Amino acid sequence: MDVLFSIAKTVSDLKKKVVVGTIYTNVEDIIQQTNELIRTLNGNTFHTGGIGTQPQKEWNFQLPQLGTTLLNLDDNYVQATRSVIDYLASFIEAVCDDEIVREASRNGMQPQSPTLIALASSKFKTINFNNSSQSIKNWSAQSRRENPVYEYKNPMVFEYRNSYILQRANPQYGNVMGLRYYTASNTCQLAAFDSTLAENAPNNTQRFIYNGRLKRPISNVLMKIEAGAPNINNLTILPDPTNQTTWLYNPDQLMNGTFTIEFYNNGQLVDMVRNMGVVTVRTFDSYRITIDMIRPAAMTQYVQRLFPQGGPYPYQAAYMLTLSILDATTESVLCDSHSVDYSIVANVRRDSAMPAGTVFQPGFPWEQTLSNYTVAQEDNLERLLLVASVKRMVM
């Protein structure tokens, strides 16, 4: 992997720096590095493709050395360099595409394609120019079964869920109480609802509890907690739990209430939050949200009409809350909304009409991967996202 990364980094730097008018001394280092790369690759033959619709191709390396000059780079020099850049970039993309459509139930983080396996041999170690990439460091640590650290913005840690839990419901569902929840990507939205607005609750306070669990623990979490839940704050016709009928979810947001969020790691309480705003949590893999809906001591006639004593109840009072994971670190590779690498992998596998593998579901859906995130999937995903990041460098 480090050899492929070094080739891609060299090509990327060469493409950026070799332009008409540049003084040669400013690009001399990258030119010499490219020539070292060419000397090492020349005389070797590699094969890519052959899976799905990917064409088989043979790469016979006989590239010319890049010359030197005492002057500024002219158009002829740049054109000659471009031909080398284009060949190397095409080679890298072909290797990456070939690697992306392969998976293994064991040792999935190790190279799987013939070319990447060949590049891992000792004869190509002189190409290892740059090993400073955090992706390479994480892959190296993971391959040694150490604990890498991945940093994510808006990490996709929540499985997609859009449902509700009923704590009370009459046969006509005109008097209901329960918890509506929506989780997806990096957000968890909750709405504790009650048609009677805690009318008969002890001390006019109705309690709701929601328990959630992540597939992988996250650490150094920066989180935003705010009132409201936009995805579930709307008039909705919902099926009843037995799918025999439907009922009307018609929430009116209530500000009277309190909440407590408890964060746990391996069953041990780690942190507790009771306030809105931006908060930090050291680490957690599960959480419990307790909401207390409080009936106001006094209400205007307009509010009383929304929740008439004894019914009928056209609305539900709803205390709403949204948790958003802004930043976090993990020891597991995840899909990140700020990176296109996962999309690159999914698109290559789809466009190549890749046959169904033994590790991931057809179509490479993140939701299904996250819902049953196995060690084999994590190992393969580590490799695939690294390869996608290499391909992105030369695209």
Curated annotation (Swiss-Prot):
Sorted UniProt keywords: Capsid protein, Intermediate capsid protein, Virion
Subcellular location(s) of the protein: Virion
A cellular component annotation (GO) from this entry: viral envelope
Cited Pfam families: Rota_Capsid_VP6 (PF00980)
InterPro entries: Capsid_hemagglutn, Rotavirus_A/C_VP6, Virus_capsid_a-hlx_vir
GO terms under biological process: fusion of virus membrane with host plasma membrane
Main location: virion
Signal peptide coordinates: none
MF GO annotations: host cell surface receptor binding; structural molecule activity
Assembly description: Homotrimer. Interacts with the inner capsid protein VP2. Interacts with the outer capsid glycoprotein VP7.
Similarity comment text for this entry: Belongs to the rotavirus VP6 family.
HAMAP family the UniProt entry points to: Rota_VP6 (MF_04126)
Function: Intermediate capsid protein that self assembles to form an icosahedral capsid with a T=13 symmetry, which consists of 230 trimers of VP6, with channels at each of its five-fold vertices. This capsid constitutes the middle concentric layer of the viral mature particle. The innermost VP2 capsid and the intermediate VP6 capsid remain intact following cell entry to protect the dsRNA from degradation and to prevent unfavorable antiviral responses in the host cell during all the replication cycle of the virus.
Name under which the protein is recorded: Intermediate capsid protein VP6
